[in-house]
UniProtKB/Swiss-Prot annotation:
Origin species: Symbiobacterium thermophilum (strain DSM 24528 / JCM 14929 / IAM 14863 / T)
Origin superkingdom: Bacteria
NCBIfam families tied to this protein: rplD_bact
Gene that specifies this protein: rplD
Name of the protein in its database record: Large ribosomal subunit protein uL4
Feature: compositional bias, Basic residues: 63-77
UniProt cross-references to Pfam families, sorted A to Z: Ribosomal_L4
InterPro entries membership: Ribosomal_uL4 (IPR002136), Ribosomal_uL4-like (IPR013005), Ribosomal_uL4_dom_sf (IPR023574)
């Protein structure tokens, strides 16, 4: 079973925690992780890009000049795709890009993403972290003490409004509750910062 150090808010080691093999020690399947990341990215797309065909562009109902006798190329409309400001051929139109994977596959991908973070030393466990009121400086100090200098994903056992409000103004830092995790958010962060209670909650949900 994988083991990781437990730190306090000051960044000092205060113990060690043994993680569940089923959740944090799963074998990583790069193909599955790639597929689930593609799914989450596809589901984020708005799909609102739109262009006008020659039938939708304003104007062009009249033949610009007679067919023969002018010495110019023949044209039937100034909104042909050949013309400047003409219609677009095979351009994008609003569509739904999203798709879904089976729940079992998504949960397996989440276990593998967490396991990959443990193996690469990118999972940090804090014994306890609570705020009485929103304070961005407190979260920034915690990350500094833990030597987190890239993007970070802070995971709490339950929804914590104070921590969420404190971290949302720090670039690259996200906060979520243990039951709301997904593989994309886990893989996107340079470091995962879990509270001990959050580790127990994740093991309860995914174990």
């Amino acid at each position: 079973m994988p083991k990781v150090a437990v730190y306090n808010k000051e960044g000092a080691t205060v113990g060690e925690i043994t993680l569940s093999d089923a959740v944090f020690g799963a074998e990583v399947n790069p193909g599955l992780l790639h597929e689930v990341v593609q799914m989450y990215l596809a589901n984020k797309r708005q799909g609102t890009a739109d262009t006008k065909t020659r039938a939708e562009v304003s104007g062009g109902g009249r033949k610009p000049w007679r067919q023969k006798g002018t010495g110019r190329a023949r044209h039937g409309s100034i909104r042909s795709p050949l013309w400047r400001k003409g219609g677009i051929v095979f351009g994008p139109h609003p569509r739904e890009y999203g798709w879904s994977m089976p729940k079992k596959a998504r949960r397996a991908a989440l276990r593998q993403a967490l396991s990959a973070k443990v193996k690469s030393g990118e999972l940090i466990v804090v014994d306890k972290f609570e705020l009485e009121a929103p304070k961005t400086r407190e979260v920034a100090t915690l990350l500094k003490n833990l030597k987190v200098d890239g993007s970070a994903f802070i995971v709490t056992a339950q929804e914590d409004v104070n921590i969420y409000k404190s971290a949302r103004n720090i670039p690259g830092v996200r906060v979520n509750a243990a039951r709301n995790l997904n593989a994309y958010d886990v893989l996107a962060a340079s470091k995962l910062v879990f509270t001990q209670d959050a580790v127990a909650k994740v093991e309860e949900v995914l174990g």
